[in-house]
A protein has these predicted regions:
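Transmembrane beta-strand segments of Gram-negative outer membrane beta-barrel proteins
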Residues: 5-54, 61-62, 88, 92
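Residues that define the transmembrane beta-barrel architecture of outer-membrane proteins
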Residues: 10, 54, 58, 66-74, ...
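Outer membrane beta-barrel
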Residues: 84-233
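Residues on the lipid-exposed face of transmembrane beta-strands in outer-membrane beta-barrel proteins
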Residues: 16, 74-80, 90, 136-141, ...
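Transmembrane beta-strands of outer-membrane beta-barrel pores
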Residues: 20-26, 94-98, 102, 156-160, ...
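Long, internal scaffold/assembly segments composed of regular secondary structure
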Residues: 247-332
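Transmembrane beta-strands of outer-membrane beta-barrel proteins
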Residues: 12-20, 88-90, 150-154, 211-213, ...
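Outer-membrane beta-barrel channels and translocator barrels
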Residues: 9, 81-85, 144-148, 194, ...
Length: 332
């Protein structure tokens, strides 16, 4: 639902999407996914040795017939177009989940005392119950330089490069993702891609050549399902990991930029893209520091690799009613 409005100097629109959805577990908790020794209400028998290393709290928290999500969410967008080719865009989203924190009360043998009797830490429970965030918030200006149209955009925005929109690890590495949102029924892709504050500039150069560059002012990371949630597969990642002894070191904000050149030859349906990018990882790598070599006491820390370089090429073309694209990326 939405509406548009217009004045002598302003054209605008405001659109809202309200969605309700639910997810239900249809199978019982599998013995081969549970460690021996769970406790609490209706605790199942586990088939795995306690030394298995399997994190089973997310599996224990929801039994057959339980709703692991029952939510109401909204996405709201404001678009304003002003004189002098100025555009303003704001998008925000919120979600309230009424079922994700209603768990079985079964605890794994190694669930820390700091985790509540519902198998969720305070951080994980807060993240599951309600979340509101600002996504896009940018202003853009169009102007002419040397007979070519230039567009400059400043603020929270998404950069879409390459041909892969749904698979991470390719050319499209500028953006962080909310993987918890992607697992939610009824999600739109624009709700799961997390914008970052950037300055981007794009322009045509003539002869079918277009160039775009950006500089990112602040690093942001991808978000994973909270520890103990239905889609959680490890106690080490996601909100609540601190209760299990895992810390995290963020990447620095500076040093991320990218440059792309797109070219479509005359009398050709094939469009080519060439890319170079410097970025910090959005997903972490684990570093374990040994504190005491005699007892093997360790301090596991998730770290985000910095100053990674990526070089890529892409191509796309129409074949009948189909659009076909391919890409190749290289990281030294």
């Amino acid at each position: 639902m939405g509406f548009t409005f217009e004045t002598e100097t302003l054209n605008g629109s405001f659109d809202s999407t309200i969605t309700a959805g639910m997810g239900l577990r249809t199978e019982s908790r599998g013995c081969n996914l549970i460690n021996q020794g769970p406790t609490g209400h209706n605790a199942p028998s586990g088939c795995l040795a306690q030394s298995s290393g399997v994190a089973d709290q997310g599996d224990l928290n929801y039994d057959r017939g339980d709703m692991f999500t029952n939510y109401l969410k909204g996405t709201h967008e404001l678009l304003l177009k002003m004189p002098e080719d100025i555009t303003f865009m704001a998008r925000g989203t919120w979600i309230r989940d009424f079922a994700a924190t209603d768990t079985t009360g079964t605890l794994s043998f190694n669930t820390p005392e700091s985790v509540g009797s519902n198998g969720l830490s305070d951080d994980a429970r807060d993240d599951l119950a309600f979340k509101a965030r600002l996504l896009d918030l940018w202003v853009s200006k169009g102007f002419d330089v040397g007979g070519q149209r230039v567009r400059a955009r400043l603020g929270n925005q998404v950069i879409n490069w390459g041909e892969s929109l749904f698979v991470a690890g390719g050319i499209n590495n500028t953006n962080a993702y909310d993987y918890q949102a992607l697992a939610r029924p009824g999600v739109q892709l624009k709700e799961a891609v997390l914008p970052a504050p950037m300055l981007s500039v794009a322009s045509g150069l003539g002869s079918g050549v277009n160039v775009e560059a950006y500089y990112q002012f602040r690093w942001n990371k991808s978000e994973l399902p909270p520890v103990g949630s239905y889609w959680s597969t490890t106690n080490a990642l996601g909100e609540g990991r601190g209760d299990y002894g895992f810390s995290e070191k963020d990447a620095r904000d500076s040093g991320q930029w990218g440059l792309s050149l797109r070219w479509q030859p005359e009398d050709s349906d094939v469009a080519y893209g060439f890319y170079v990018m410097r970025y910090h990882d959005k997903l972490p790598s684990l570093r374990v520091a040994i504190l005491d070599p005699n007892t093997f006491a360790a301090a596991p820390t998730w770290e985000y690799q910095e100053d990674r370089m990526m070089y890529g090429i892409s191509a796309n073309m129409p074949i009948g009613d189909w659009a076909v694209g391919t890409e190749l990326s290289y990281r030294p």
